[in-house]
UniProtKB/Swiss-Prot annotation:
Protein name (Swiss-Prot/TrEMBL): Uridine-cytidine kinase 1
Annotated stretches, region: Disordered: 1-30, 247-277
Keyword Membrane: no
Amino acids binding ATP: 30-38, 215
Described purpose of this protein according to its UniProt entry: Phosphorylates uridine and cytidine to uridine monophosphate and cytidine monophosphate. Does not phosphorylate deoxyribonucleosides or purine ribonucleosides. Can use ATP or GTP as a phosphate donor. Can also phosphorylate cytidine and uridine nucleoside analogs such as 6-azauridine, 5-fluorouridine, 4-thiouridine, 5-bromouridine, N(4)-acetylcytidine, N(4)-benzoylcytidine, 5-fluorocytidine, 2-thiocytidine, 5-methylcytidine, and N(4)-anisoylcytidine.
Length: 277
């Protein structure tokens, strides 16, 4: 495998490993600890893909967290003290991310970096992502760059209350061995301001907004059905900017708000009430 120690890590696979069709790329965004990865894992579970051998999976998950830049010694020292802003767009290797997604969309097998959140470093080991029919790419800023945003065939935004997100982040970082005071200082100094400046404004690019994350099974089930239709070949893959100009806008906030399909070209009136405070 290619080394991930500071160099570009994605590498195309041999021609024999490439599929005959391009995958359907779904972007999943939302604030820190909003439940993005949990939503993706639930989708995988409901599709019966989480027990499938990696090479045979029709749906795969990839995280933006894998594309954090390699830190200098000075930056790593700050990171270990909770004084480095991991929620800023510049914290990510966007060029590598774009090239990797481009290769994925072209149906190639790629190798992606592995990031250690305890030591704040990119590990030598890489992870192989095999071609799949549907790829879920999740992260706090996956909609920030237009170049990357425009690659998605469907965009989901997981909209979870800020207090819930904070409590989840505290529990997660404590499990990583972080000090509570450091966690809270980092949240107020970097995480919350970055969410409001960089992540929340990208909510407007979402086709489907999912309040309460994985607890919102109305939205999850609808998305799963949509993906199942794609896997079954019942829905033609659509691309933004096409002749029909299709886009889907929908927010699912209340029990019973479950149309039979994603609503084309409009947002639900419930969306304005789902913004975090």
């Amino acid at each position: 495998m290619a080394s991930a120690g500071g160099e570009d890590c994605e590498s195309p696979a041999p021609e024999a490993d490439r599929p005959h069709q391009r995958p359907f790329l779904i972007g999943v965004s939302g604030g820190t600890a909003s439940g993005k990865s949990t939503v993706c894992e639930k989708i995988m579970e409901l599709l019966g893909q989480n027990e499938v051998e990696q090479r045979q999976r029709k749906v795969v998950i990839l995280s933006q967290d894998r594309f954090y830049k390699v830190l200098t010694a000075e930056q790593k020292a700050k990171a270990l003290k909770g004084q480095y802003n991991f929620d800023h767009p510049d914290a990510f290797d966007n060029d590598l991310m774009h090239r990797t997604l481009k290769n994925i969309v072209e149906g190639k097998t790629v190798e992606v970096p592995t990031y250690d959140f305890v030591t704040h470093s990119r590990l030598p080991e890489t992870t192989v992502v095999y071609p799949a029919d549907v790829v879920l790419f999740e992260g706090i800023l996956v909609f920030y760059s237009q170049e990357i945003r425009d690659m998605f065939h469907l965009r989901l935004f997981v909209d979870t209350d800020s207090d819930v997100r904070l409590s989840r982040r505290v529990l997660r970082d404590v499990r990583r061995g972080r000090d509570l005071e450091q966690i809270l200082t980092q949240y107020t100094t970097f995480v919350k301001p970055a969410f409001e400046e960089f992540c929340l404004p990208t909510k407007k690019y979402a086709d489907v907004i999912i309040p309460r994350g994985v607890d919102n099974m109305v939205a999850i089930n609808l998305i799963v059905q949509h993906i199942q239709d794609i896997l079954n070949g019942d829905i033609c893959k659509w691309h933004r900017g096409g002749s029909n100009g299709r886009s889907y806008k929908r927010t699912f906030s209340e029990p019973g708000d479950h149309p039979g399909m994603l609503t084309s070209g409009k947002r639900s009136h419930l969306e304005s009430s789902s913004r975090p405070h």
